[in-house]
Amino acid sequence: MSFTIPTNLYKPLATKPKHLSSSSFAPRSKIVCQQENDQQQPKKLELAKVGANAAAALALSSVLLSSWSVAPDAAMADIAGLTPCKESKQFAKREKQALKKLQASLKLYADDSAPALAIKATMEKTKKRFDNYGKYGLLCGSDGLPHLIVSGDQRHWGEFITPGILFLYIAGWIGWVGRSYLIAIRDEKKPTQKEIIIDVPLASSLLFRGFSWPVAAYRELLNGELVDNNF
């Protein structure tokens, strides 16, 4: 006996299509690429920030170096068109005119006379004053007169800010000593008499204590003693 097995009953196993394998791995590769891009993007931003900071630091250093390299007179002259007095022709002309007038007055007196000596001393003071204007960097306008800079520029504090603070300190010192003197004598039998005839020992002791008047005023302000409630 022989058996015949039909071949049409054999069905091979289904194989995966090629397009399925390619499609199944494609999204994974895309996700990996996206993750890599996400990881690289912060690094690029950090590098960009570092580069920007370095460029800003370089620009700032160049500005500072250029400002130090500029001559002081040129930097100081860059204020409202003013020029250093020692370079101003009008300033030099005013000095010559002032000395010329004094020289003309000097010819009217004998060399050893008191007026002549006084005029010579005035001439020396005039020369010294003009020299100091040029030496300390004051700025002059087109009229040849020195101009005080009150804008708060640190290069010109010695012209207005420092003298102004010193004036306020001295004025406050005088006022504080006078106030302390009036407070000290108000319990006397004749306080008005001591206002007319100053008690020198008392005033002298208060005079030296008045140097610390800003500290004393602040302390009395905190204690409520700065203002008298009776007035």
From Swiss-Prot:
Coiled-coil regions, chain positions: none
Principal location listed in the UniProt entry: plastid
GO cellular component terms attached to this protein's record: chloroplast thylakoid lumen; chloroplast thylakoid membrane; photosystem I reaction center
Protein location: Plastid, Chloroplast thylakoid lumen
GO MF term list: phosphoprotein binding
Record-linked InterPro entries: PSI_PsaF, PSI_PsaF_sf
This protein's UniProt keywords: Chloroplast, Photosynthesis, Photosystem I, Plastid, Thylakoid, Transit peptide
An individual GO BP term: photosynthesis
Function in brief: Probably participates in efficiency of electron transfer from plastocyanin to P700 (or cytochrome c553 in algae and cyanobacteria). This plastocyanin-docking protein contributes to the specific association of plastocyanin to PSI.
Family: Belongs to the PsaF family.
Matches recorded under PANTHER family: PHOTOSYSTEM I REACTION CENTER SUBUNIT III, CHLOROPLASTIC
Protein name, per record: Photosystem I reaction center subunit III, chloroplastic
Gene name, Swiss-Prot/TrEMBL: PSAF
